[in-house]
Design a protein with these regions (language model features):
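Compositionally biased, low-complexity segments enriched in small residues
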Residues: 1, 23-26, 53, 84-86
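Polyanion-binding surface elements
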Residues: 2-31
Length: 100
């Protein structure tokens, strides 16, 4: 991925989600296995992929609150550099969540 190019919807790996939630990837795997976390979608290679909305859901399940800061940090590490676009992306997901 180019450092300044935003894809329409960022996808996260289990490792990314573990960093965001401050847990190990094994913890996430165990919680999925025990049905405490919903099973994520899979990509063409059958790897688990998590959307931004999935990550917010897991934050709510884990901590009963939403905090976009660790998500922004991981997105930045993945090459998302445009903070304005990151803000719009996160605001868009949060706005949709409030409307539901």
């Amino acid at each position: 991925m180019s450092n300044n190019k935003m894809s329409p919807e960022p996808m996260f790996t289990r490792g990314d989600v573990a960093k965001i939630l401050n847990v190990t990837p094994l913890t996430i795997a165990n919680r999925e296995k025990n049905e405490k976390y919903p099973e994520p979608a899979r990509d063409l290679n059958n790897y688990r992929v998590y959307t931004l909305n999935d990550v917010f859901n897991l934050q709510l399940i884990t901590y009963s609150s939403l905090d976009p800061r660790p998500i922004i940090s991981v997105l930045y590490d993945k090459g998302y550099r445009d903070t304005k676009e990151l803000g719009k992306l996160i605001d868009g997901v949060l706005t949709k969540r409030k409307g539901v």
